[in-house]
Amino acid sequence: VTGAALVGLAAPSVASPTDPVVHFSPTLTRAMPGGGDCAAIINAETVPQPQAGTFGVRLKITQTGERCGAYRVAVRWRNLDTGIENGQSHRVTGTVIDAKDNIITGFGTAPGVGRVEAHIVTTTEDHRDMEHLSGDATFTLR
């Protein structure tokens, strides 16, 4: 089973970035809530946004197993130049992100211009980290 989502971070800037698409290392997660025998591979890549200092993340989730419960996928980031850090998570049921058409945008927060370190992680619905190997990427936003 596979699905795709777009995770977007928005900021009130008017510049248009020319940021390249950057691929995260794969996120691997297992022992999904629900008592099932489940595992997922989450592939992700950045998606340039029209506002400077912002980025989106497109996710593709491949899940296998039985009795897989709902969980959350989180994008956690840190601006290495300013030290600002934040993130956002969204509910996943199977491979469906909790958003219209599997597209998530408009977090209302962004790392700003500079070098950014970001991680894709999985958590339970009450935001406790699940067993996972995070997907990581470092990139520069203009």
Name the predicted role of every residue range:
Residues 21-74:
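Short, surface-exposed binding/anchoring microloops in extracellular/periplasmic proteins
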Residues 44, 139-140:
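Solvent-exposed beta-strand/loop surfaces, strongest in extracytoplasmic domains of secreted
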Residues 24-26, 135, 141:
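Generic structural "secondary-structure junction" signal
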Residues 11-13, 34, 114:
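Generic detector of short, well-ordered, non-transmembrane alpha-helical segments enriched
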Residues 6, 48-50, 66-68, 109, ...:
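Sterically constrained small-residue positions within well-ordered secondary structures
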Residues 73-138:
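Extracytosolic low-complexity repeat regions of secreted or lipid-anchored proteins
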Residues 1-15:
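Secretory targeting and sorting signals
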